[in-house]
From Swiss-Prot:
CDD domains: FACL_DitJ_like (cd05934). Coiled coil: none annotated. It comes from Escherichia coli O17:K52:H18 (strain UMN026 / ExPEC). Keywords: Ligase. GO terms for biological process: carnitine metabolic process; fatty acid metabolic process. InterPro entries: AMP-bd_C, AMP-bd_C_sf, AMP-binding_CS, AMP-dep_synth/lig_dom, ANL_N_sf, CaiC. HAMAP family: CaiC. Its EC number is 6.2.1.48. Catalyzes the transfer of CoA to carnitine, generating the initial carnitinyl-CoA needed for the CaiB reaction cycle. Also has activity toward crotonobetaine and gamma-butyrobetaine. Belongs to the ATP-dependent AMP-binding enzyme family. One of its GO terms (molecular function) is carnitine-CoA ligase activity. This is Crotonobetaine/carnitine--CoA ligase. Pfam families: AMP-binding (PF00501), AMP-binding_C (PF13193). Pathway: Amine and polyamine metabolism; carnitine metabolism.
Length: 517
C-alpha cells in the first residue's frame, strides 16, 4: 500500500505552496531574539533559490552535501533545496568537534559543506589535515575570508531565480538524507532516509498528535536530529500547520516562547522537564494554548505528575529512534494513556518482545523490543556503506532489532525498561539503569542522575551513581545511600557516588555514558 501517493519532496513543496500560499509556514527565532517568518509560498521560493544555488556550485542528483548548522532558516532551505534536485543532505551534530566532524565528512563522501562563522575555523583545519572529498564551503553569516573554495550562501542564494532551474527525475525510493546516529556507545552509523521515509513521517507524526492546519508546532530540538525533522517539521508541513523553530533551548525563555507564538503542540525530553521544574513558579505557568506535549523517554511517575500538574499539560508518549524515523510505539490520539507504558504500536507497524534466540515472548516476559516495518518506507533503508551493521539489526522481512529491553501487557501496551547495553550485571542479577535513575530522581535535592556499571572483580559489575544537585543543595554520602536502601532492593543500591556540576549529553539530551567512569 502506497500511503504517500507516490509523492516525493519536490512535489510536496510545490503542492503546499499552491494550497496554502500566504499562510505562515515557518517561524525561526534566533538566540539573539531575531525572528524570521515565511509563508508557504515564500518558503518554497527560498527552497527553490537554494536548490539553484547548489546547482550552480556543481551539485547534482546523488551528491552529498553536509550541513553543520544550529537551528536557522538556512537549514530548512538546504534540507528541501537539496531534496528538490535529488541531492542528499548530511546533517552534522552542531556540538561535534574536529575529529568527529571530519570522520562524518569522510565517511559520508560529502563534497560540499554549508556552515557558519563559529564552525568555519574547525573546517579550515580539517581541510588542511584530513583527507576528504570536500570541494567547497558555503558560509551563511560572515564576510568572506580570502580563501579559495569559500562563498557566501546568502549572496549566492539571492542571485538565484525563485523558480527551479534543474529538476531531474525523482523517485520516492531516492535517498534524501544520511543521518549519522549519535554514537553514544560506538562510532556513528549513517542512517539512510528516503523521500518516502520523510513523506510517510509527516503523515504519521501528524496523525500521532491529531495535527491540523490551524496548529502551531514549536520545537527547540536541534534541526540535525530526527525528532525535529520527522516528528515536528515534517508533521507540521504535511498538515499545512505553522512550524516554529527556536535556535537554542532556554528553560527561562521556553514558556514565554510557547505563549508568544500560541503554540498548540511541542516536544520535550526529560532534561527539559527537569530544568523547567526548577524554574521559579509563575502565575503564567498555565497560560498557554498547548494541547499536546510529545514526550520521549524516560521520566519517573512522580516527575511526570508534578510537571503535568504545575503546567496543566499532558504528555503524549512516543518511542522510537533514528532507524525507525518516527515514534513507532506511542500513545494514540483519543486513546487512554497508561503510564508508564510507552503505548502501543502505531499503524503500519508490528511490535514484539523477543528472547535472545529471536523467539517471540508472551505478555509479561522481559526481552528485546522488535519492530516490523518496510525498509526505505516506514523504517530506515540501511546503514550507509555498512551492510554488516545493517544485517545485524534489520532482518530481510523488515523486523528491526532495537537493542532496547522491555515487555508488553495482555492489552498490547509496551513498557520500556532500558537499553540492553545499559543493563548492569551484578552478582547474577540484571539491574536496569533507568529503573534506578527514576528512583533516585525522586530525591528532593537531586536535579539530574545517571548510574553506570563499573568493573567489579567479585560481582561482575558495581553500580556508580553520578548526580547533579539542585542549586544551593548539599548531599552527604550517608544521606544518599540511606535513601537508596529505603527505596530499592539491596542488590540494586549503588556502591559509589560522585557529585558533579553537570552530566555529558549529546544533541538529543541523552547522557553519554561512555564518558563516565
Amino acid at each position: 500500500m502506497d500511503i504517500i501517493g507516490g509523492q516525493h519532496l519536490r512535489q510536496m513543496w510545490d503542492d503546499l505552496a499552491d494550497v496554502y500560499g500566504h499562510k505562515t509556514a515557518l517561524i525561526c527565532e534566533s538566540s539573539s531574539g531575531v525572528v524570521n517568518r515565511y509563508s508557504y509560498l515564500e518558503l518554497n521560493q527560498e527552497i527553490n533559490r537554494t536548490a539553484n544555488l547548489f546547482y550552480t556550485l556543481g551539485i547534482r542528483k546523488g551528491d552529498k552535501v553536509a550541513l553543520h548548522l544550529d537551528n536557522c532558516p538556512e537549514f530548512i532551505f538546504c534540507w528541501f533545496g537539496l531534496a528538490k534536485i535529488g541531492a542528499i543532505m548530511v546533517p552534522i551534530n552542531a556540538r561535534l568537534l574536529r575529529e568527529e566532524s571530519a570522520w562524518i565528512l569522510q565517511n559520508s563522501q560529502a563534497c560540499l559543506l554549508v556552515t557558519s562563522a563559529q564552525f568555519y575555523p574547525m573546517y579550515q583545519q580539517i581541510q588542511q589535515e584530513d583527507a576528504s572529498q570536500l570541494r567547497h564551503i558555503c558560509l551563511i553569516d560572515m564576510a568572506l575570508p580570502a580563501d579559495d573554495g569559500v562563498s557566501s550562501f546568502t549572496q549566492l542564494k539571492n542571485q538565484q531565480p525563485a523558480t527551479l532551474c534543474y529538476a531531474p527525475p525523482l523517485s520516492t525510493d531516492d535517498t534524501a538524507e544520511i543521518l549519522f546516529t549519535s554514537g553514544t556507545t560506538s562510532r556513528p552509523k549513517g542512517v539512510v532516509i528516503t523521500h518516502y521515509n520523510l513523506r510517510f513521517a509527516g503523515y504519521y507524526s501528524a496523525w500521532q498528535c491529531a495535527l491540523r492546519d490551524d496548529d502551531v508546532y514549536l520545537t527547540v530540538m536541534p534541526a540535525f536530529h530526527i525528532d525535529c525533522q520527522c516528528t515536528a517539521a515534517m508533521a507540521a508541513f504535511s498538515a499545512g500547520a505553522t512550524f516554529v523553530l527556536v535556535e537554542k533551548y532556554s528553560a527561562r525563555a521556553f514558556w514565554g516562547q510557547v505563549q508568544k507564538y500560541r503554540a498548540t503542540i511541542t516536544e520535550c525530553i526529560p532534561m527539559m522537564i527537569r530544568t523547567l521544574m526548577v524554574q521559579p513558579p509563575s502565575a503564567n505557568d498555565r497560560q498557554h494554548c498547548l494541547r499536546e506535549v510529545m514526550f520521549y523517554l524516560n521520566l519517573s511517575e512522580q516527575e511526570k505528575d508534578a510537571f503535568c500538574e504545575r503546567f496543566s499539560v499532558r504528555l503524549l508518549t512516543s518511542y522510537g529512534m533514528t532507524e525507525t524515523i518516527v515514534g513507532i510505539i506511542g500513545d494514540r490520539p483519543g486513546d487512554k494513556r497508561r503510564w508508564p507504558s510507552i503505548g502501543r504500536a502505531g499503524f503500519c507497524y508490528e511490535a514484539e518482545i523477543r528472547d535472545d534466540h529471536n523467539r517471540p515472548l508472551p505478555a509479561g516476559e522481559l526481552g528485546e523490543i522488535c519492530i516490523k516495518g518496510v525498509p526505505g518506507k516506514t523504517i530506515f533503508k540501511e546503514y550507509f556503506l555498512n551492510p554488516k551493521a545493517t544485517a545485524k539489526v534489520l532482518e530481510a522481512d523488515g523486523w528491526l532489532h532495537t537493542g532496547d529491553t522491555g515487555y508488553r501487557d495482555e492489552e498490547g501496551f509496551f513498557y520500556f525498561v532500558d537499553r540492553r547495553c545499559n543493563m548492569i550485571k551484578r552478582g547474577g542479577e540484571n539491574v536496569s539503569c533507568v529503573e534506578l535513575e527514576n528512583i533516585i530522581a525522586a530525591h528532593p535535592k537531586i536535579q539530574d542522575i545517571v548510574v553506570v556499571g563499573i568493573k567489579d572483580s567479585i560481582r561482575d559489575e558495581a553500580i556508580k551513581a553520578f548526580v547533579v544537585l539542585n542549586e544551593g543543595e548539599t548531599l552527604s554520602e550517608e544521606e544518599f545511600f540511606r535513601f537508596c536502601e529505603q527505596n530499592m532492593a539491596k542488590f540494586k543500591v549503588p556502591s559509589y557516588l560522585e557529585i558533579r556540576k553537570d552530566l555529558p549529553r549529546n544533541c538529543s539530551g541523552k547522557i553519554i555514558r561512555k564518558n563516565l567512569k
